[in-house]
Amino acid sequence: TAYLESNRDENGVWDGKGLRPEQIQGFGLGVMNARAAYFAKRDPRLASFLTEGRSFGPHGTGLFIANSIDHYDEALSQELTQLTVTANLKMREIGFKPYVAPALSSGALSLLLTLRGAWHCGSVFLDGVFMGVKNRYTPAGVETELLPRIPDPLFGHIREAAEHLKSVL
């Protein structure tokens, strides 16, 4: 939204005079990654996420949590994704609207990592959409993590997320 709206004139017509895509980063993936880690710490079956896992996609629809890149398990990844996506809804069901934890994991901590040039989860402009991936800022610009191999089923989920994001623009 920041990118699109900043590049429209007062009549809503695209003028390209606003923010450049590389000037924007979304930090919603940070909170989702932290939620996945929460569940991985409590279930030995999901523990591989803590050292080998990754989060991909947007903060909402299309988010996918991989239990591991090297030892990818579709069923475990689906389970971890579902737990992560529904965690916020469960908190709201019991009467809490989470503010502090997301503000720290998605905002403050991710922003500090960004400013330090450290690896973190965030949405950066890739192939015409803001896609959540592990990335960092360097003097040359944003660097996204290059994985030597992405399991085909996982790549399919990432592709689906990107196509979904393109469809809502």
Regions found by a protein language model. Give the residues of each.
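Long, compositionally biased stretches enriched for glycine and/or charged residues
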Residues: 42-169
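Rossmann-fold dinucleotide-binding core
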Residues: 1-72
